[in-house]
Amino acid sequence: ISVCELYGKLREDKAYRRHPGSLYRVFVRLGFRKKPESTKKKSKHTGTYDTPTSIGEKWQMDVKYVPNACYSGKDGQKFYQYTVIEEASRKRFLYAYEEHSSFSTVDFLKRAILFFGYAPGILQTDNGGEFTHPSKTSRIHPLDVFCNRYRIRHKLIRPRTPWHNGKVERSHRNDQERFYNDLRFYSFSDLQTQMKRYLYRSNNIPMAVLGWKSPNQVQKDLSGR
């Protein structure tokens, strides 16, 4: 369990009101976590980014390869995690697939719209084949067909600039630490079940960038419900 997650549980269940930094220092003092030496390099990407303040303005979508080490099967099957993040609240939807393809992408977007209860104004993705065709072809990608039908603007980031999809990229790093590092599953349906539980958990973890509220809390505040 992370300090952020513990902080959220203490605040909700025990009315804890001290700053999360105090809780982190207690963790370090008790030896549960060592203070890492600073290895952070200055970012080369200093441009500003305007995060939407209203839900439904913009989603980021990406796909993550599920590590082989998590799967106890012997058939060599591969699995993929599709992710969409609501930029304004950081609330996410995840779903597992056995392939990353245009079919999986469109199916996932349909499921995401049902999960959130609305479609985004803008859907931002990278230039992977599951999201777009090469620029040299005149064919229309199935994702673009779907987006055009529902008046969603499909925005592609520039090639080799993953930081432009930074929110969903960072969330995948958190998934590795909080979920995949300790995950063991024996079948595709088992992966789906465990991922569903993890999705509920992750959307309830407070985040510093959200003023120590969880994505679910911010989503509720912004939707007025």
PLM regions with names:
Residues 1-59, 63-66, 141, 218-223:
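Basic, flexible linker segments flanking DNA-binding modules
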Residues 6, 23, 62, 84, ...:
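Mobile genetic element proteins and their domesticated derivatives, centered on retroelements
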Residues 61-93, 103:
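An active-site-proximal beta-strand-loop segment
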Residues 72-73, 96-97, 133-138:
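Short, solvent-exposed loop/turn segments at secondary-structure boundaries
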Residues 100, 118-135, 158-160, 212-215:
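Acidic/histidine-rich, metal-coordinating catalytic segments
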Residues 126-127, 137-147, 154-177, 193-196, ...:
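RNase H-like two-metal-ion nuclease catalytic core shared by retroviral integrases
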